[in-house]
Protein backbone atom coordinates (compact mmCIF):
# COMPACT_ATOMS: atom_id res chain seq x y z
CA UNK A 1 0.00 0.00 0.00
CA UNK A 2 1.06 3.55 -0.73
CA UNK A 3 -0.27 6.39 1.43
CA UNK A 4 -0.59 10.00 0.23
CA UNK A 5 -0.93 12.94 2.61
CA UNK A 6 -0.90 16.73 2.24
CA UNK A 7 1.96 18.96 3.43
CA UNK A 8 1.51 21.63 6.14
CA UNK A 9 1.88 25.41 6.14
CA UNK A 10 3.47 25.35 9.61
CA UNK A 11 7.12 24.30 9.56
CA UNK A 12 9.62 23.27 12.25
CA UNK A 13 13.34 23.59 11.60
CA UNK A 14 14.51 23.77 15.21
CA UNK A 15 13.34 20.80 17.33
CA UNK A 16 15.63 17.76 17.79
CA UNK A 17 15.67 15.29 14.89
CA UNK A 18 14.36 11.75 15.41
CA UNK A 19 16.78 10.45 12.77
CA UNK A 20 19.94 11.72 11.08
CA UNK A 21 19.31 9.75 7.87
CA UNK A 22 18.16 11.65 4.81
CA UNK A 23 17.52 11.35 1.08
CA UNK A 24 17.30 13.91 -1.72
CA UNK A 25 13.97 14.89 -3.32
CA UNK A 26 13.54 13.30 -6.74
CA UNK A 27 11.89 16.22 -8.56
CA UNK A 28 14.26 19.09 -7.74
CA UNK A 29 14.64 20.06 -11.40
CA UNK A 30 10.93 20.89 -11.40
CA UNK A 31 11.21 22.70 -8.06
CA UNK A 32 14.02 24.86 -9.47
CA UNK A 33 11.78 25.89 -12.37
CA UNK A 34 9.05 27.00 -9.95
CA UNK A 35 11.54 28.82 -7.72
CA UNK A 36 12.80 30.82 -10.72
CA UNK A 37 9.20 32.01 -11.24
CA UNK A 38 8.68 32.71 -7.53
CA UNK A 39 11.92 34.69 -7.18
CA UNK A 40 10.47 37.30 -9.55
CA UNK A 41 7.45 37.93 -7.31
CA UNK A 42 7.42 40.99 -5.06
CA UNK A 43 6.27 40.57 -1.45
CA UNK A 44 3.08 42.48 -2.36
CA UNK A 45 2.40 40.06 -5.23
CA UNK A 46 3.03 37.08 -2.91
CA UNK A 47 0.63 38.51 -0.31
CA UNK A 48 -2.08 38.88 -2.96
CA UNK A 49 -1.41 35.53 -4.66
CA UNK A 50 -1.41 33.52 -1.43
CA UNK A 51 -3.88 35.66 0.58
CA UNK A 52 -1.37 36.08 3.41
CA UNK A 53 -0.19 38.97 5.59
CA UNK A 54 2.62 41.32 4.57
CA UNK A 55 4.81 39.80 7.30
CA UNK A 56 4.31 36.27 5.92
CA UNK A 57 4.81 37.54 2.38
CA UNK A 58 8.18 39.05 3.36
CA UNK A 59 9.18 35.77 5.04
CA UNK A 60 8.34 33.75 1.94
CA UNK A 61 9.96 36.20 -0.47
CA UNK A 62 13.11 35.66 1.60
CA UNK A 63 12.69 31.89 1.45
CA UNK A 64 12.35 31.98 -2.33
CA UNK A 65 15.45 34.15 -2.74
CA UNK A 66 17.56 31.97 -0.41
CA UNK A 67 16.40 28.65 -1.89
CA UNK A 68 19.04 26.72 -3.82
CA UNK A 69 19.10 23.06 -4.87
CA UNK A 70 22.19 22.01 -2.93
CA UNK A 71 20.33 20.40 -0.01
CA UNK A 72 22.33 19.49 3.10
CA UNK A 73 21.34 18.78 6.73
CA UNK A 74 22.63 22.29 7.48
CA UNK A 75 20.21 24.13 5.17
CA UNK A 76 17.33 21.64 4.92
CA UNK A 77 15.38 19.12 7.00
CA UNK A 78 13.66 15.78 6.39
CA UNK A 79 10.15 16.53 5.11
CA UNK A 80 8.32 14.32 7.60
CA UNK A 81 10.04 16.16 10.47
CA UNK A 82 9.76 19.65 8.95
CA UNK A 83 5.98 19.78 8.47
CA UNK A 84 4.04 20.63 11.64
CA UNK A 85 0.29 20.92 10.92
CA UNK A 86 -2.69 18.97 12.26
CA UNK A 87 -1.94 15.91 10.10
CA UNK A 88 1.61 15.81 11.47
CA UNK A 89 0.40 16.18 15.06
CA UNK A 90 -1.50 12.93 14.51
CA UNK A 91 1.47 11.31 12.77
CA UNK A 92 3.88 12.24 15.58
CA UNK A 93 6.94 11.18 13.56
CA UNK A 94 9.26 12.66 16.18
CA UNK A 95 8.66 9.44 18.16
CA UNK A 96 9.29 7.06 15.22
CA UNK A 97 11.92 4.33 15.46
CA UNK A 98 14.41 3.77 12.64
CA UNK A 99 12.27 0.80 11.53
CA UNK A 100 9.21 3.09 11.42
CA UNK A 101 11.14 5.50 9.18
CA UNK A 102 12.15 2.58 6.93
CA UNK A 103 8.53 1.52 6.47
CA UNK A 104 7.35 5.12 6.02
CA UNK A 105 10.05 5.80 3.40
CA UNK A 106 8.64 2.98 1.30
CA UNK A 107 4.92 3.47 1.92
CA UNK A 108 4.27 7.18 2.62
CA UNK A 109 4.33 10.10 0.17
CA UNK A 110 3.69 13.79 0.81
CA UNK A 111 2.23 15.79 -2.07
CA UNK A 112 3.70 19.28 -2.42
CA UNK A 113 3.12 22.37 -4.54
CA UNK A 114 6.87 23.03 -4.78
CA UNK A 115 8.40 19.55 -4.54
CA UNK A 116 5.68 17.51 -6.27
CA UNK A 117 6.14 14.30 -4.27
CA UNK A 118 8.26 13.94 -1.14
CA UNK A 119 9.39 10.81 0.66
CA UNK A 120 9.59 11.10 4.47
CA UNK A 121 13.40 11.36 4.61
CA UNK A 122 13.74 13.71 1.62
CA UNK A 123 15.47 16.93 2.64
CA UNK A 124 13.37 20.03 2.15
CA UNK A 125 14.18 23.72 2.35
CA UNK A 126 11.40 25.87 3.87
CA UNK A 127 8.74 27.18 1.52
CA UNK A 128 5.09 28.08 1.18
CA UNK A 129 3.43 27.23 -2.11
CA UNK A 130 0.08 25.54 -1.80
CA UNK A 131 -1.08 23.29 -4.63
CA UNK A 132 -4.12 25.47 -5.29
CA UNK A 133 -2.00 28.61 -5.87
CA UNK A 134 -2.74 30.23 -9.23
CA UNK A 135 0.92 30.72 -10.10
CA UNK A 136 1.37 31.33 -13.82
CA UNK A 137 4.17 29.26 -15.31
CA UNK A 138 5.38 28.03 -18.68
CA UNK A 139 2.93 25.10 -18.56
CA UNK A 140 -0.18 27.12 -17.75
CA UNK A 141 -2.06 29.21 -15.24
CA UNK A 142 -1.60 27.12 -12.09
CA UNK A 143 0.37 24.36 -10.38
CA UNK A 144 -1.98 21.62 -11.59
CA UNK A 145 -1.00 22.40 -15.17
CA UNK A 146 2.66 22.67 -14.15
CA UNK A 147 2.78 19.23 -12.54
CA UNK A 148 0.64 17.58 -15.22
CA UNK A 149 1.26 13.81 -15.12
CA UNK A 150 4.54 14.04 -13.19
CA UNK A 151 3.12 13.42 -9.71
CA UNK A 152 0.98 10.51 -10.93
CA UNK A 153 3.99 8.94 -12.66
CA UNK A 154 6.04 9.25 -9.47
CA UNK A 155 3.33 7.51 -7.46
CA UNK A 156 3.13 4.76 -10.09
CA UNK A 157 6.89 4.23 -9.75
CA UNK A 158 6.55 3.88 -5.96
CA UNK A 159 3.68 1.40 -6.35
CA UNK A 160 5.67 -0.61 -8.88
CA UNK A 161 8.73 -0.66 -6.59
CA UNK A 162 6.73 -2.33 -3.83
CA UNK A 163 4.82 -4.59 -6.23
CA UNK A 164 1.49 -3.23 -5.08
CA UNK A 165 -1.64 -1.67 -6.56
CA UNK A 166 -3.44 -0.01 -3.63
CA UNK A 167 -3.24 3.71 -2.84
CA UNK A 168 -4.67 5.01 0.44
CA UNK A 169 -5.64 8.64 -0.15
CA UNK A 170 -5.29 10.62 3.08
CA UNK A 171 -4.55 13.90 1.27
CA UNK A 172 -6.93 16.86 0.99
CA UNK A 173 -8.96 17.42 -2.19
CA UNK A 174 -6.77 20.42 -3.07
CA UNK A 175 -3.68 18.23 -3.17
CA UNK A 176 -5.12 15.02 -4.56
CA UNK A 177 -6.45 17.02 -7.51
CA UNK A 178 -2.80 17.00 -8.70
CA UNK A 179 -3.10 13.21 -9.12
CA UNK A 180 -4.79 11.76 -12.21
CA UNK A 181 -6.73 8.68 -11.04
CA UNK A 182 -7.30 7.46 -14.63
CA UNK A 183 -3.53 7.17 -15.11
CA UNK A 184 -2.85 5.72 -11.66
CA UNK A 185 -1.99 2.02 -11.64
CA UNK A 186 -3.81 1.49 -8.37
CA UNK A 187 -7.10 0.90 -6.65
CA UNK A 188 -7.94 4.07 -4.73
CA UNK A 189 -9.21 3.83 -1.16
CA UNK A 190 -10.23 6.94 0.76
CA UNK A 191 -10.71 6.83 4.54
CA UNK A 192 -13.29 9.39 5.75
CA UNK A 193 -13.44 10.56 9.36
CA UNK A 194 -16.73 11.81 10.79
CA UNK A 195 -17.21 13.42 14.19
CA UNK A 196 -20.52 13.72 16.00
CA UNK A 197 -21.74 17.24 16.69
CA UNK A 198 -25.20 17.91 18.11
CA UNK A 199 -26.26 14.38 17.26
CA UNK A 200 -25.10 14.51 13.63
CA UNK A 201 -21.94 13.08 12.08
CA UNK A 202 -19.90 15.28 9.76
CA UNK A 203 -16.36 16.04 8.66
CA UNK A 204 -14.85 18.60 11.03
CA UNK A 205 -11.68 19.84 9.34
CA UNK A 206 -9.37 20.07 12.38
CA UNK A 207 -10.32 16.61 13.65
CA UNK A 208 -10.29 15.05 10.17
CA UNK A 209 -6.77 16.35 9.47
CA UNK A 210 -5.45 14.96 12.74
CA UNK A 211 -7.23 11.64 12.05
CA UNK A 212 -5.49 11.37 8.66
CA UNK A 213 -2.20 11.62 10.51
CA UNK A 214 -3.32 9.08 13.11
CA UNK A 215 -4.31 6.64 10.36
CA UNK A 216 -0.93 7.12 8.65
CA UNK A 217 0.80 6.39 11.96
CA UNK A 218 -1.44 3.34 12.53
CA UNK A 219 -0.48 1.90 9.13
CA UNK A 220 3.23 2.62 9.59
CA UNK A 221 3.63 1.38 13.16
CA UNK A 222 1.59 -1.77 12.56
CA UNK A 223 3.28 -2.41 9.17
CA UNK A 224 -0.11 -2.80 7.46
CA UNK A 225 -0.06 -4.00 3.84
CA UNK A 226 -3.73 -4.91 3.16
CA UNK A 227 -6.68 -2.45 2.95
CA UNK A 228 -8.83 -4.80 5.05
CA UNK A 229 -6.47 -4.17 7.98
CA UNK A 230 -7.40 -0.46 8.04
CA UNK A 231 -10.82 -1.34 9.45
CA UNK A 232 -9.17 -2.12 12.80
CA UNK A 233 -8.23 1.57 13.20
CA UNK A 234 -9.46 2.65 16.63
CA UNK A 235 -7.21 5.50 17.77
CA UNK A 236 -8.67 8.37 19.83
CA UNK A 237 -12.22 7.00 19.79
CA UNK A 238 -12.75 6.38 16.05
CA UNK A 239 -14.40 3.15 14.91
CA UNK A 240 -15.05 1.67 11.47
CA UNK A 241 -18.66 2.03 10.28
CA UNK A 242 -19.39 -0.78 7.82
CA UNK A 243 -22.94 0.39 7.02
CA UNK A 244 -21.73 3.75 5.67
CA UNK A 245 -18.63 2.41 3.90
CA UNK A 246 -18.03 1.07 0.40
CA UNK A 247 -15.18 -0.85 -1.22
CA UNK A 248 -13.35 2.40 -2.01
CA UNK A 249 -14.46 4.61 0.89
CA UNK A 250 -13.90 3.53 4.48
CA UNK A 251 -15.93 5.55 6.99
CA UNK A 252 -14.80 5.96 10.59
CA UNK A 253 -17.01 7.66 13.17
CA UNK A 254 -16.33 9.14 16.57
CA UNK A 255 -19.11 9.88 19.04
CA UNK A 256 -19.30 13.17 20.89
CA UNK A 257 -17.53 12.95 24.23
UniProtKB/Swiss-Prot annotation:
Pfam families attached to this UniProt entry = H2O2_YaaD
Q: Name one GO cellular component term.
A: cytosol
Superkingdom, natural source: Bacteria
Q: Which InterPro entries match?
A: YaaA
In the record, biological process GO terms are: response to hydroperoxide
Database matches in NCBIfam families: PRK02101.1-1 (NF002541), PRK02101.1-3 (NF002542)
Q: Which family does it belong to?
A: Belongs to the UPF0246 family.
Q: Can you say what this protein is called?
A: UPF0246 protein ECA3888
Q: What is the lineage of its organism?
A: Bacteria, Pseudomonadati, Pseudomonadota, Gammaproteobacteria, Enterobacterales
Amino acid sequence: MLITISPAKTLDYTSPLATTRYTQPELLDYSSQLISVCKKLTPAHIASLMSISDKLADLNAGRFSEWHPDFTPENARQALLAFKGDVYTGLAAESFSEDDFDFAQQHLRMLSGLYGVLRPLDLMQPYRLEMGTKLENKAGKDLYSFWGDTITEKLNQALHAQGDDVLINLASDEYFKAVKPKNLNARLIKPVFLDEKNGKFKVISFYAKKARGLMSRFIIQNRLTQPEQLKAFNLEGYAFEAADSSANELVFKRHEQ
